[in-house]
Amino acid sequence: MADGEGGAASAPTAGTRPVYRRVLLKLGGEMFGGGHVGVDPDIVASIARQIAAVVAEGVQMAVVIGGGNFFRGAELSVRGMDRARSDYMGMLGTVMNCLALQDFLEKLGVDTRVQTAITMGQVAEPYIPRRAIRHMEKGRVVIFGAGLGAPYFSTDTTAAQRALEIGAEVVLMAKAVDGVYDSDPKTNADAVRFDHLDYDEVLARDLKFADATAISLCRDNGMPIIVFNLLEEGNIARAVHGEKIGTIVSSGDGVPPRRQAVSPAR
């Protein structure tokens, strides 16, 4: 279903409670650089404030960050570099973004851990899902870096896989636009935004907000996705409060199912 207009989202309704207990937030690396190479401190600070506000409400949060503001393996390989090697360069870029976000969160008093799929003990813990869950249960934000630690897999796929393994209830896919459109709204003024999409419709239409592997993984395991505009302050809170912003990708009628957040056996 499409509504044709983005519109500005209102502030979260006063007195409401979050509808999700544990979420995974996917951030594109390009957003960290504000369209440029490197990290824009103002943007990262804004993201950190939004995350801190949600964590203060008791929501358990994990984050996956891309590295497109530094390197993009698939693009480097087109220029003649070995694909696997260029993907590893991209993974290192994601870790730089993780450390930047960690720094801004810690400055706000939010206890944070970075876990990476490639061992780098001086700056991060190794990725251990049970440990990540324990951190979140203690109110810490866990930031996952270095993708899946293997070439040929995107950070979108990483987000889907990590969300499933840590028992998240939803993937919050943050973008620079307010949802999924039938064409690029930056070049087509008549582009129509979808309120809800089924996984199979996303794949059939070849909509490019995430790669097919990530969408298939979410579809096969019933993991809902909310695609929303991160650049509007407060939208992360609106998403976890269940407000209808952006585009919901799920099966059924557009209401994300409440997946059960899980904890490891004690």
Swiss-Prot record:
It is found in: Cytoplasm. Its EC number is 2.7.4.22. Keywords: ATP-binding, Cytoplasm, Kinase, Nucleotide-binding, Pyrimidine biosynthesis, Transferase. CDD domains: AAK_UMPK-PyrH-Ec. ATP binds at residues 26-29, 68, 72, 181, 184. GO terms for cellular component: cytoplasm. GO terms for molecular function: ATP binding; UMP kinase activity. Homohexamer. Belongs to the UMP kinase family. Catalyzes the reversible phosphorylation of UMP to UDP. This is Uridylate kinase.
